[in-house]
Amino acid sequence: MRILPCTPPWLRLALSLALSFTASSGFADDLNDHILSLRERAEITDQILEDRLETVVPEVMRAAGIDAWVLIAREYNEDPIVKTMLPATWLNARRRTVLMFIDQGPELGVARMAVARYPVGKLFPGVWNPEQQPDQYGRIAQILDEANPARIALNYSDVYALADGLTYSEQRDFLQALPIRLRDRVVSSEAVAVGWLETRTAAEMATYKTVMEIAHRIIAEGFSSDVITPGVTSTEDLEWWFRQRVNDLGLQTWFHTSIEVERSDRSKQEIAANNLDPNLLLRGDHVHIDFGISYLNLQTDTQQ
C-alpha cells in the first residue's frame, strides 16, 4: 500500500466529523452515536473520491507511462475498478458507462470525462450526446483520435483479477471502432488499476483510524460478558452476533466472521470425557476472531 502525503484543507470538517469519538465506555451509546448517517457518509466519501481522482490517477498513469485510460462497464455487470470511481448516488453503472482519463501534460493535467448518457455526478462531465451521435463507441474513438495518445490502457489482465473487468464483447467493440493506427497502442491497465487500488491518501489514512476504532469497539463488545455466556454461547452464535451487530449499526461486513477456540490438550480431554459440545465457549478458552467491516469505502481486516 502506498500513501500520498497531503490532506486537502476542504476535508478537515468532514474528517473532524468522522473522527468525533469520545472516551465513554458504553458500547451501544458510543457506536450508535458516532456512526454517520448515509448522507453524511456520502459527503465524506465523495470528497475523498474527488481528491483521489485529482491526485492518485495522474500519479499512477504517469508512473505506468499511460496517456489514456478507458474504463467500460455495463449495467448489471460491473467492472470492479469503475465501481470504486462512482459517486455515492451512483450505486452501479447505468446502461453502458464509459469513464475516460486523458493526460494532457503537466500544465493541463489529466482530463476526466464520461462517454455516457449522463454525467457521472460532478466528477465526470458528460461528453456524448446520443441524439447527435448515436454510436457511443464512435464517440469514444473520436476522442481518442483527437487526443492521439501513445499508450491506451484497458482493464484486462492475466494476473490481477481486479484489473480484468472488461468483458470480451466490450473489448471487441471498442477495438473495432478504434482507428487502425491506434489499435497497437492498446495495453493492459494492470499497473494503473493496481496503483489506483493500493494507494491511500492522507485523508483516507486519517479516516481509517475511525474505521479501525469502530471495529475494535465491536470486537470488545462481542468478547464481553454482555454477549458471551460460558457453556451456553457457541462459536457459531458469536459469529452470527458479530454479523448482526454490524448490520444493526448500519455497516457491512465484507467476509463472514470466523471464531476459533484454542485449548490445551488437557481441556480437550476434559470436554470429551464429560461429553460437552466442543463448539461451546467455556471459561479459560482462548478465543480468536477474524473480523472485517466496511465503512466510508474502507475495509478492516482484524485478527485478535
Predicted feature descriptions by range:
Residues 12-22:
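Bacterial N-terminal signal peptides
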